From Swiss-Prot:
It is an enzyme of class 6 (ligase). Binds 1 zinc ion per subunit. Its cofactor is Zn(2+). This is Threonine--tRNA ligase. Belongs to the class-II aminoacyl-tRNA synthetase family. GO terms for biological process: threonyl-tRNA aminoacylation. Residues 1-64 form the TGS domain. The keyword Nuclease does not apply. Zn(2+) binds at residues 347, 398, 530. It catalyses: tRNA(Thr) + L-threonine + ATP = L-threonyl-tRNA(Thr) + AMP + diphosphate + H(+).
Length: 666
């Protein structure tokens, strides 16, 4: 065994240290100030405790400013939460407390569940523990000792967790002062390094191990950041997100609802269905003259899904069906016992349409589009309004082309996707290329060619946008059947949503034996490109509702104008105004109720109606209207003709405006 350890630093320099030197020793050898800031080390990219002995490899000193420190901060905060709870409520059992996206949680076994009122008290105790600046210290125990100690403490859940640790793994115990817990680590040097930028968010129930047959525990969710400003920003975004929650706005705007008899499927109300149809009509216009719109069956025999591979790869997410007679009479030889499946994807159906009739290379590319209703099983706990459903409509398209046409088709698709997002106000978009995973179909040569083409396309996307569109690579994140582009857009409060995809598929055409006749009269397998812009149209509508906080652009609002009268003397004029607005193509309702105008304005503002036209006796005499915009206290008076012309222009979809502008002579 060598007496020295060789370490390579980020600047490329190499230094030797005595065997047994710790990460802290290395940090101190660089500077006292760095050692003070250090919270951990990374050896060959793996984060470890500062107190761990170093080994040969590449080393980095991790400080609180390092993005990798955030997980440590949250992990350590979870431990402090557990200590605080056991100090305040002796006898409470701690179970598990992992770091999750945007924070952490800890599950506790306690006779009386926690309440939201307990959280500020626990936070106060946590700050006391952090102020003590107790060092984190690691020990390795035998399995027998760990079981004995935690059993003696009455920690039955910890004993179960210890028993579940594989025999070849050490039982690590982390101390912070006198409190200790089994944990894989790593941790920072002391509780004081956590800081005070943390908050306990909510209390919830959770079954032990996620199994409803097990005891119910109390879960406390929290979050933590390196800086208070980061926490404040996060809490601000959460507050904004709550105001914008599409489920809440959907009720207020009377758009849709869900109910127990149809978990994960949408009951669209009149206004919501208008919005859905507006999105469909917009997308249909964008595809006109470029794609053939088709429609494939929703229910297909299991054998087709076996051929496509979905039955083997995706079965747990599929709905299988039989005739009701077959279900109730399983032994009836006369009953049709075949198993069918509701389609989870549109692609196999589109391959069947492509295969119907011989195709020549001269006919390629063939572009098939469908607003296809698909069904995918999601666990009930994962369902979330329009964002996560079991039945949804995909704005799906599949392009069948030659390898030589692939780059041009990907660029054409990209231009369409970015144009659609811009029409809906999304200007910040990131495009990432996901490359080959370890498990995949198709030869390396085929992947090489596809990835080479798509890498060039990615460069072209960034160059053509003048750098406005950010791009990146996701190594190994491609599907097993081909590389793909993922489009992520940023909404009004900075949240990111992955929506569009462009995916090359080497698998499905081969499975179904799809081919075209090439210029040499040979059968050749086409390249298949899957394309979605909205992805799920229901989810995209949810994103739009939250992005605009319900204040939809006039061209996309399901109800554009409410004509509200101040007095019954203006009702006839109000009817005339509404009729003229409808004749001009606007979506209009009237409100002639015997209520004060401020009450009417308030009610329609809650419903997020973009324009309220107020008509009184004077307006009727002068044939004018008072226009009040959603979110504004100001009223603008104009003639009815002026108002109609202005609103009709504003209510014209952006793609229609562009088309009209292109037709105008120069």
């Amino acid at each position: 065994m060598s007496d020295t350890v060789s370490l390579t630093f980020p600047d490329g320099s190499v230094r030797s240290f005595a065997a047994g030197a710790t990460g802290r020793d290395v940090a101190e050898s660089i500077s006292k100030s760095l050692a003070k800031k250090a919270v951990a080390i990374a050896l060959d990219g793996v984060v470890r405790d500062l107190a761990d002995p170093v080994v040969d490899g590449k080393i980095e000193i991790v400080t609180r400013a390092d993005p990798r420190a955030l997980e440590l901060i949250r992990h350590d905060t979870a431990h402090v939460l557990a200590e605080a709870v056991q100090e305040m409520w002796p006898g409470t059992q701690v179970t598990i407390g992992p770091v999750i996206e945007n924070g952490f949680y800890y599950d506790f076994a306690k006779n009386e569940p926690f309440t939201p009122e307990d959280l500020p008290k626990i936070e106060k105790k946590m700050k006391e523990i952090i102020q003590r600046n107790q060092p984190f210290r690691k020990e390795v125990w035998s399995r027998e000792k760990a079981r004995e100690v935690f059993a003696a403490k009455g920690e039955s859940y910890k004993v179960e967790l210890i028993d579940a640790i594989p025999e070849d793994q050490d039982i690590k115990i982390y101390y912070q002062g006198d409190w200790f817990d089994p944990c894989r680590g790593p941790h920072m040097a002391s509780t004081g390094q956590i800081g005070t930028a943390f908050k306990l968010m909510k209390v919830a129930g959770a079954y032990w191990r996620g199994d409803s047959n097990n005891p119910m525990l109390t879960r406390i969710y929290g979050t933590a950041f390196a800086e208070q400003e980061q926490l404040d920003n996060y809490l601000h975004i959460l507050a904004e997100a709550e105001k914008r929650d599409h489920r809440k706005l959907g009720r207020e705007m009377d758009l849709f609802h869900f109910q127990e008899e149809g978990p994960g499927v949408v009951f669209w109300h009149g206004k919501g269905w208008k919005m859905f149809q507006s999105l469909t009509a917009y997308m249909r216009r964008r595809l006109a003259n470029t794609y053939q719109e088709v429609n494939a069956p929703q229910v297909l025999d299991k054998s087709l899904w076996e051929t496509s591979g979905h039955w083997g790869w995706y079965q747990e997410n599929m709905f299988a069906v039989k005739s009701a007679h077959a279900f109730t009479n399983p032994n009836d030889p006369e009953a049709d016992q075949r198993v069918f499946a509701l389609k989870p994807m549109n692609c196999p159906g589109h391959v069947q349409i492509f295969k119907h009739g011989l195709k020549s290379y001269r006919e390629l590319p063939v572009r098939l589009a469908e607003f296809g209703l698909v069904h995918r099983y999601e666990a009930s706990g994962a369902l979330h309004g329009l964002m996560r459903v079991r039945g949804f409509t995909q704005d799906d398209a599949h392009v069948f082309c030659t390898e030589e046409q692939m780059a041009a088709e990907c660029l054409r698709i990209n231009d369409l996707i970015l144009s659609v997002y811009e029409d809906f106000g999304f200007k910040e978009v990131v495009v990432k290329l996901s490359t080959r995973p370890e498990k995949r179909v198709g030869s390396d040569e085929l992947w090489d060619r596809a990835e080479s083409v798509m890498t060039e396309v990615l460069k072209a996307i960034e160059e053509q946008s003048g750098g406005r569109i950010k791009t990146g690579i996701l190594p190994g994140e491609g599907a097993f059947y081909g590389p793909k582009f993922e489009y992520t857009l940023k909404d009004a409060i900075g949240r990111e949503w992955q929506c569009g995809t462009t995916q090359v598929d080497f698998n499905l055409p081969e499975r179904f034996g799809a081919f075209y006749i090439d210029q040499h009269s040979e059968k050749t397998q086409p390249v298949m490109i899957h394309r979605a812009i909205c992805g799920s149209m229901e989810r995209f509508l949810g994103i739009l509702i939250e992005n605009f906080a319900g204040h939809m652009p006039l061209w996309f609002a399901p109800l554009q104008v409410v004509v509200a009268t101040i007095t019954s003397e203006a009702d006839d004029y109000g009817r005339d105004v509404a009729e003229q607005l409808r004749d001009a193509g606007l979506e209009v309702e009237t409100d002639f109720r015997n209520e004060k105008i401020n009450y009417k304005v308030r009610e329609h503002s809650v419903g997020k109606v973009p324009v309220i036209m107020v008509c009184g006796k004077r307006e009727a005499e002068e044939r004018t209207v008072n226009i009040r915009r959603l979110g504004s206290q100001d009223q603008v008076s104009m003639t009815l003709d002026e108002a109609i012309a202005s609103l009709v222009d504003e209510a014209t979809p952006p793609d229609v405006k562009r088309k009209r502008a292109a037709r105008k002579p120069a």
